Amino acid sequence: MKTITLLIPVYNEESVLPQLFKRLDEFTKNTPNYQFEFLFINDGSTDKSFSIIAEQSKKDSRISYINLSRNFGKEIAMIAGIDHVKSDALVIIDADLQDPPELIQEMISYWEDGYDDIYARRNNRQGETWLKKKTSQWYYRILQKSTNIPIQVDTGDFRLLDRRCIEALQKFRESQRNTKAIFSWIGYKKKEIFYDRDPRLAGQTKWNYRKLLNLAIDGITSFTTAPLRMATIFGFIVSFIAFVWIVYLLVRPLFGVSTGAGYSSLMAVILFLGGVQLLSLGVIGEYVGRIFIETKNRPLYLIEEYHAGNIKKTRR
């Protein structure tokens, strides 16, 4: 019997966990031909999420859990789980039930047809503001334009991955991660399915615009040098315009045209060039900072407690 692990990152989800357990149990009862493991990654929750998971694991032998030593963020929590997956396939799903577990049956069907990465694309994003929807769309399209990788648009982490995709993901050890882009980078045979994303069942979203901005910066700087190239091109254009302007100022007196004091225009040019320089330094600093962090070679995460359920491990 093939084994499938459901990887579920958790951060302060105590209000939704009981309903999640129920939905997962109903799903597995309707999918009897596979052996399932529910691998919960507690990412430093400050509520009762971990104690609820630990208690439920005593009742359900399919539940495994990793309790991280602190909050490392969802990207790191996912790789912590991926590192411990031994099953034939992996499904990544959020704990908030916005992604319906029932859709996994369709993913499994395509997996049996030979697809390696079956990802769910959202028809709609209920419960999200217009601004969040638009900024997400812009981000994916900018990332697509600035890389030579076919980025999957309007998708999250909800997907099924074959064993060889799991082993490929385990090789990525960078600390500044954008897993959604990594899914695209590894390639393999992909299949897109569409679904309507539900609003949160309970609790509040853990994402805010600051976290989304950081994720966007990580994604762009991890997979493309386009910002550096743009800074170079912009610097060349500004330098060329400045050169033409200088030539113009030198030629004007030859035709009897007074140059005038020009303090206002001079200050405007100085401030503009100063802003361009600071922006360029900021872009360079982002890349240098990431190089500095990666060269430290620190562990991506630390585990406080690991509990393995009774699922039969088919890989080593």
Protein language model features and the residues they cover:
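Structured catalytic core of nucleotide-sugar glycosyltransferases
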Residues: M1-G127
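Short conserved micro-motifs on helix faces and helix-strand junctions that flank
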Residues: P9, L68-R70, R159, T232, ...
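Residues in soluble alpha-helical coiled-coils and helical-bundle/repeat scaffolds
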Residues: Y11-S15, Q98, E102, Q170, ...
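Residue-level signature of catalytic and energy-coupling elements of molecular machines
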Residues: L24, G81, D96, I118, ...
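Conserved amphipathic alpha-helical interaction elements at protein-protein interfaces in regulatory
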Residues: E26, N30, E55, K59, ...
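Acceptor/aglycone-binding surface of glycosyltransferases and processive sugar-polymer synthases
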Residues: R62, I66-R70, K74-H84, P100-I182, ...
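Hydrophobic helical membrane-anchoring modules
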Residues: N178-R316
